[in-house]
Amino acid sequence: MSAATKKRYITNKVGSEFYELVDEDIIAQVRQSRGNNLHEVLDQNGDSYVVSMPTKFRKSVWLRRDQFVVVRPITEGDKVKGEIEYILDQDNVLYIRELGKWPTCFEENALKMTREAKRGQTSDKMIDDDMLPPSESEEEDESEGEETYDEDDVDDEEEEEFDTYNPNRMQAPSK
C-alpha cells in the first residue's frame, strides 16, 4: 500500500466506523501535545500521563486539545504509559454513551455534543410552538387584527404602469 492509500484508508476508517471498546481500553481526554507524537491525557480514573500516537495515525489524523481518544495501556515505558488505539469523533462519543460505557467523569462533555445541547433545548420532550400548525383560536386572533381593503381605497398612483428597463434585452425606452 502506498502512503497516500494508507492515509486515505485511516482517514475513512476513523470517520466512518463506530469503535467497540475492549476490556482493557481506557477513554481519555487529550490535555496537550508534548511533541514527537506524544500527548498528555487525562483518563477516566483521573490520572494524567503521556501516551504515544502509533505510526498509522501520524500525518493522517490530527488531535486537538480536549478531544477524546481510546488508550491501550503499555507496560514497557516509565513516562509513556499508553498508546492511542483510536481517536473518537463526536459520533463515536455519542455511540459509546448510548451503549452505557461512557465514563461518568466525562459525561458533561458528552452532553455538550448532543443535538439537544447544540440547539439549546432542554430535556423536556415538548414540541416548540413555532413547529406546530396554528390552532383555531390563533387564526381567529389573527383575523381580528387584520384590516381589509376595498378596491376603491387603493391609490391611483399604484395603478400606473411602470416602464421596466432590462439592460440585457433592449435599449432603454424613450419617453
Swiss-Prot record:
Gene3D superfamilies found in the cross-reference section: Nucleic acid-binding proteins
Entry keywords, A to Z: RNA-binding
UniProt xrefs under InterPro entries: EIF1AD (IPR039294), NA-bd_OB-fold (IPR012340), RNA-binding_domain_S1_IF1 (IPR006196), TIF_eIF-1A (IPR001253)
Comp. bias intervals (Polar residues): 165-175
Keyword Cytoplasm listed: no
Any single Gene Ontology cellular-component annotation: nucleus
Basic and acidic residues composition-biased segments: 116-128
Protein family: Belongs to the EIF1AD family.
Entry protein name: Probable RNA-binding protein EIF1AD
